[in-house]
Regions:
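Eukaryotic alpha-helical solenoid repeat scaffolds
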Residues: 371-477
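Amphipathic alpha-helical segments of tetratricopeptide repeats
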Residues: 183-190, 224-236, 272-279, 313-321, ...
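Helix N-cap/loop-to-helix boundary motif
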Residues: 146-153, 190-197, 234-244, 281-286, ...
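Cullin-RING E3 adaptor/co-adaptor recruitment helices
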Residues: 1-177, 181-186
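Single-residue signature of alpha-solenoid repeat helices
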Residues: 175-178, 218, 266, 308, ...
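"A position-specific structural signal for the A-helix of alpha-solenoid helical repeats
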Residues: 154-157, 161, 165, 197, ...
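Residue-level detector of the short coil/turn that links helix A to helix B
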Residues: 116, 170-173, 213, 261, ...
Length: 477
């Protein structure tokens, strides 16, 4: 039925004949509304599942409005969730000619509200990994992949984007699993076509593993990535392509060493990333923002608070200008800004930053996401510290309980997250720590800094970098 409706719609559209008022619903809108209404009416009769199977044969421009319409009806959330966890259907939307991520994320937010099953992206990632494993087994069983190179390459590019999307949505472990299988797919490509993809996959995989605290796997990925970085000069001299994400590689190596608290190596790779960074197109500007965050974290770890505050403030300003104030990447920078303020004992500004970040991530991913768990935990800790001044611990306890409840729903097997949140809750229940200094710092606010060019930032940092070396020599002497 639905295919005939859409064929009629296209014939009417191309005929150029309009027999309805200008402001009336289009034929496509009428078809979508009629289809979703019929699904609602037949849901209790047991044949609605058969009707929705036809969605797999529709292109993305027609799928999107149908799923968007389904979001209006709470009784269809379970059905919407089942459709979105189907990797074939989801990838049709994800890879659309002009992906409408706003609508897609709206559908994911609604599907997460289906009774007791909020982890939509986790289940989707598991189904997608099963699909990749099936394709890998099929390719290896046939033994001949030469004729399948275009299809394999398309799947690799899709998996790279999807793994990155899972990481950005807070599902770091799921993203790491997808990217691990992507590596196995890349091996099936011809060597000359796979080198750049191998390095790009390693960079993204390392980022996801760091986010998921998969330290042992991240250490192995670092060794493979270092081998690529060392070989690149020789590749360039031989005339081969050098279009490899060097800045991103330096950046993730620096992030790894910061994560394992090897600050000397973090400093080394941060310097190389900053020296290689350049303002240009949107990806290059994103690299600069990431480099500024890494160097700011390094400065805070070395207790250079003024420099760290200046650098993270530059990252916040650039992210707001580049992405806008309601973008997921701006929220990521804002979260790091809150963390830097917390490390500087600037509790009240940190609470403001984390609260704004929670509002943005709630608008993008909903409040049933791993981001909400982390941010609620940060807010609980900040409000606990703030409570030593105000004497009120109820707000801190409320955020801690919310974080624990979300963690039990979204990541019930993550003992590390639960232990950290339970520790925060225990501190709150224990009451004030009389040994704690309640005096808070008041650093310069982000908006107090004027925007520096990348050249000015490099000059300031490299000028001050010599002081790091002098301090290191003094300590060693």
């Amino acid at each position: 039925m639905i295919s005939e409706l859409f064929q009629t719609m296209h014939k009417a559209r191309f005929s150029g004949i309009r027999i309805v008022p200008e402001n009336s619903p289009s034929l496509q809108q009428s078809c979508v509304r009629a289809f979703v209404e019929s699904v609602r009416q037949t849901k209790t009769q047991g044949d609605s599942e058969e009707r929705l199977m036809q969605l797999q044969f529709l292109p993305a421009p027609l799928l999107t409005p149908i799923l968007d319409r389904m979001c209006r009806y709470p009784e269809l959330r379970d059905m919407l969730r089942d459709e979105l966890t189907d990797p074939v259907l989801f990838m049709k939307l994800f890879n659309g000619y002009a992906p409408d991520y706003d609508t897609l994320e709206k559908c994911l937010r609604e599907a997460a509200r289906a009774g007791g099953r909020p982890a939509v992206l986790r289940d989707l990632a598991n189904n997608y990994c099963d699909m990749l494993r099936t394709e890998l087994r099929s390719a290896l069983r046939k033994g001949e992949t030469h004729g399948q190179q275009p299809r394999i390459r398309a799947r690799v590019l899709e998996s790279l984007r999807f793994g990155d999307y899972l990481y950005e949505a807070g599902w770091c472990r799921c993203g790491a699993e997808v990217l691990t299988l992507t590596q196995e797919l890349i091996v099936l490509l011809l060597p000359h076509a796979s080198r750049a993809l191998q390095m790009e996959c390693l960079v993204r995989l390392l980022r996801a593993q760091i986010g998921a605290c998969m330290n042992a796997r991240a250490a192995a990925t670092v060794q493979r990535l270092l081998a690529f970085v060392v070989e690149i000069p020789a590749v360039g001299e031989s005339g081969a392509t050098t279009l490899l994400p060097l800045v991103k590689a330096y950046l993730q190596l620096g992030c790894y060493y910061y994560h394992v608290q090897d600050y000397d190596r973090c400093h080394q790779w941060a310097l190389r990333a900053l020296a290689s960074a350049a303002d240009g197109d949107a990806p290059a500007k994103g690299d600069v923002i990431d480099v500024l965050q890494l160097i700011a974290l390094f400065c805070i770890a070395k207790e250079r608070h003024d420099l760290g505050n200046m650098l993270i403030s530059q990252a916040v300003q650039r992210a707001r200008t580049e992405y806008g104030s309601l973008h997921r990447k701006y929220a990521d920078v804002l979260q790091q800004y809150g963390f830097v303020l917390l490390r500087m004992n600037a509790i009240l500004p940190a609470i403001t930053a984390f609260t704004e970040c929670l509002d943005i991530t709630g608008r993008v991913y909903g409040l049933l996401s791993p981001h909400a768990v982390v941010l609620e935990g940060y807010l609980a800790h900040c409000l606990y510290l703030r409570s030593h001044t105000t004497g009120r611990f109820d707000m801190a306890l409320r955020h801690a309980e919310t974080a624990l409840e979300l963690a039990s729903q979204l990541m019930p097997t993550s003992r590390r997250v639960r232990q950290q949140l339970e520790h925060t809750r225990d501190l709150i229940l224990r009451g004030p720590d009389n040994r704690r200094d309640t005096k808070e710092s008041q650093p310069s606010r982000e908006r107090d800094f004027h925007s520096f060019t990348l050249h000015e930032i490099k000059e300031k940092f490299f000028e001050l970098d010599s002081s790091f070396e002098r301090d290191g020599l003094a300590c060693s002497g």
